[in-house]
């Protein structure tokens, strides 16, 4: 029999249905010479540092750097049962070969290989590589299974990525956490992404706006401008000189321009536009397209390609027709698609651009959640736009000369709306006000025309600071590691991959280093402080992008994994050596985040409010006051923060309403600290005489 292992149960069910494996078992399905099971994502992961040595359970500076000589892997605790199922199936004598059917990408390969190796399996396996979960795509994929060894380099790159993240994350996080006494999470990709947020925030906070003035002259529907005049006095002088005077059309240029249709969506571009149009976070969009993929309504979403292959032309035409019939927004739209414009075999590696599938024909779109309908509309719109006609317009540039000053204006007239007609239809459905196009059509004039008695006016303006990143603009920056110099034909060296960028943004928010304000992503105080204390080799987007590029080269067989990891280890060791100690002032950069209520009577260190206690901040000191200690509990009292503060401040506190089983009434007493330095703090009572 053949054992097929998918990444998750829903995908396994789709595959099992096609293969005829319809008999349900505990953790798998069986039938038609196939056993189909699944992984629940990562079942096996790199072991924690404490698995290598018990002393690593405590975070100590002196243990750094931690670099395993031989890597260990462990089964994820809450997924142990499914690993047992897979391990048993791999050892089943009926099974002669396997099919890796996890997601067709770097992480999917890693998920399968780690389970395969951890289970000690040596049976041959083939690779299912598909871009859709439609029945026809699954059948086609099983008819063209590939030798699993063809993907050894992909696995090597995935494992190298995982090890590099472990080395940088474990050592960087422990190093700066022990130095600053606050958990500071450092990540190979997460930290440089945070650095971009901090850099932008710094530019905004230090920005000094400058005032400038524009002078406008015109008559009737024609107005031209002289921009960026430095002083109000000069602007007013120019306006006064031109008021009621004659202006001449000194130059008139007309040019026909075209705007090519946009490319199809890859994941990052889709996430950006879903954020711009709908306000979806990158993670929300990823979750939605993954759901639609599993519903067989979209092709594989974690792609970095914006093209399809030439053998998909007929399918693309069919899907365009289905989109116009099935998505109400585009009903009645009729286009003659130019499929050649979105076809380029050389720009499709693992997966083609994201498209709706022919399965959409059978779907009642109105029955889908609104969020899924929005994503389908967005992808449908892009498909129609990308294969539509060019947008053509005539641009007119006019210069007016008046009293020795040149005033300029631009206008345009649409010649052929082309693909923009579909985009406008989509934008109109959003019911949000679009910004007015600054270039409107101009009245007809000719060079040399005179305008008598023009009016002149002055407007005041200010230079504007850079804008905070949104998920749209941050994803764009991550694609190029903050380098804006890439053109469309340059291979980008970015931060992370399309599949991981959403998770990176979420980690920054969950760790408290960034926060969402409306659509903006803003670094927190801790986020800014973290970037300030970290060295450039950790915060540099360019360096991290080079690492990501090396991983791609490992995948292609052009770089050595051992050399890559050696460089990561060397950098980590240098990092630890560069931070042997901190001054007391620097160590308090992040503060404690804890409430101090007094000084320890044993060592003089601050005493903080804890969970159910008040404890000495000195780890070598055991002084602690418990809210529900036996002394106070026996008197039906709780040691409150107010009582603790007085005990630390004066050594005693007057407490009222104390209980004793010997008498029916409550009593008052002075309670004093009677601390002998032992494990528990003692108290004694004094009564008024």
Predicted regions and their residues:
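Metal- or metallocofactor-binding catalytic centers and their adjacent structured scaffolds
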Residues: 149, 232-265, 271, 542
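Amphipathic alpha-helical transducer elements in NTP-driven molecular machines
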Residues: 9-16, 33-36, 40, 76-87, ...
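Phosphate-rich ligand and nucleic-acid binding surfaces
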Residues: 221-223, 253-254, 324
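Basic, low-complexity terminal or inter-domain segments flanking catalytic cores
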Residues: 2-3, 90, 173, 206, ...
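C-terminal or mid-to-C-terminal helical accessory/interaction module adjacent to the motor/catalytic core
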Residues: 93, 135-217, 254-258
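Conserved short loop/turn motifs at secondary-structure junctions
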Residues: 1, 101-104, 181-183, 254-263, ...
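Intrinsically disordered, low-complexity regulatory segments
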Residues: 1-162, 166, 454, 465
């Amino acid at each position: 029999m053949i054992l097929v292992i998918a990444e998750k149960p829903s995908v396994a069910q789709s595959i099992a249905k096609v293969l005829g494996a319809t008999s349900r078992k505990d953790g798998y399905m069986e039938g038609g010479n196939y056993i189909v099971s699944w992984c629940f994502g990562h079942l096996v992961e790199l072991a924690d540092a404490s698995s290598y040595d018990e002393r690593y359970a405590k975070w100590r500076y002196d243990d750094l750097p931690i670099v395993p000589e031989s890597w260990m892997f462990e089964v994820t605790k809450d997924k142990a049962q499914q690993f047992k199922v897979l391990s048993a199936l791999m050892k089943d004598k009926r099974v002669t070969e396997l099919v890796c059917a996890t997601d067709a990408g770097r992480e999917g390969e890693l998920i399968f290989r780690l389970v395969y190796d951890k289970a000690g399996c040596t049976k041959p396996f083939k690779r299912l590589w598909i871009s859709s979960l439609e029945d026809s795509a699954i059948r086609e994929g099983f008819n063209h299974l590939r030798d699993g060894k063809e993907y050894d380099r992909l696995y090597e790159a995935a494992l190298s990525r995982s090890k590099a993240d472990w080395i940088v994350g474990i050592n960087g996080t422990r190093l700066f956490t022990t130095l600053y006494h606050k958990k500071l999470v450092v990540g190979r990709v997460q930290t440089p992404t945070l650095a971009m947020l901090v850099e932008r925030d710094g530019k905004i906070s230090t920005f000094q706006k400058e005032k400038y003035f524009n002078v406008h002259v015109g008559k009737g529907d024609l107005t031209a401008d002289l921009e960026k005049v430095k002083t109000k006095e000069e602007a007013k002088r120019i306006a006064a000189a031109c008021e009621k005077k004659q202006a001449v059309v000194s130059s008139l240029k007309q040019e026909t321009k075209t705007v090519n249709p946009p490319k199809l969506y890859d994941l990052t571009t889709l996430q950006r536009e879903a954020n711009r149009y709908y306000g979806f976070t990158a993670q929300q969009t990823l979750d939605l397209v993954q759901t639609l993929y599993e519903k067989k309504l979209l092709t594989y979403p974690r792609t970095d390609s914006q093209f399809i292959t030439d053998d998909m032309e007929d399918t693309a035409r069919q899907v365009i027709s289905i989109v116009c019939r099935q998505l109400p927004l585009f009903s009645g739209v009729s286009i003659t698609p130019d499929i050649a414009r979105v076809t380029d075999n050389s720009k499709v590696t693992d997966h083609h651009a994201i498209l709706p599938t022919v399965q959409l024909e059978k779907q009642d779109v109105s029955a889908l959640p609104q969020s899924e309908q929005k994503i389908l509309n967005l992808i449908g719109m892009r498909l129609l736009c990308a294969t539509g006609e060019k947008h053509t317009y005539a641009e007119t540039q006019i210069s007016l000369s008046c009293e020795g000053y040149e005033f300029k204006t631009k206008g345009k007239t649409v010649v052929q709306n082309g693909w923009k007609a579909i985009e406008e239809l989509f934008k109109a459905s959003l019911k949000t006000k679009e910004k007015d196009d600054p270039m409107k059509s101009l009245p007809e004039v000719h060079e040399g025309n005179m305008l008598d008695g023009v009016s002149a006016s002055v407007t005041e303006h200010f230079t504007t600071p850079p804008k905070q990143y949104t998920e749209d603009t941050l994803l764009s920056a991550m694609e190029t590691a903050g380098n804006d110099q890439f053109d469309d034909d340059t291979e980008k060296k970015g931060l992370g991959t399309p599949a991981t960028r959403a998770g990176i943004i979420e980690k920054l928010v969950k760790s408290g280093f960034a926060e969402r304000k409306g659509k903006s992503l803003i670094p927190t105080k801790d986020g800014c402080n973290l970037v300030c204390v970290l060295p450039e080799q950790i915060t540099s987007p360019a360096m991290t992008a080079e690492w990501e590029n090396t991983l791609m080269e490992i995948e292609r067989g052009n770089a050595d994994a051992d050399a890559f990891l050696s460089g990561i280890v060397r950098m980590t060791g240098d990092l630890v050596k560069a931070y042997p100690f901190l001054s007391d002032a620097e160590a308090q950069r992040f503060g404690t985040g804890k409430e101090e209520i007094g000084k320890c009577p044993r060592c003089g260190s601050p005493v903080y409010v804890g969970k159910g206690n008040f404890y000495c901040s000195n780890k070598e000191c055991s002084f602690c006051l418990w809210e529900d200690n036996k002394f106070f509990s026996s008197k039906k009292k709780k040691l409150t923060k107010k009582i603790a503060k007085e005990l630390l401040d004066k050594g005693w506190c007057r407490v009222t309403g104390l209980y004793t089983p010997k008498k029916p009434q409550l009593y008052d007493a002075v309670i004093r600290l009677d601390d002998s330095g032992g494990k528990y703090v003692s108290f004694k009572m004094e009564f008024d005489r």
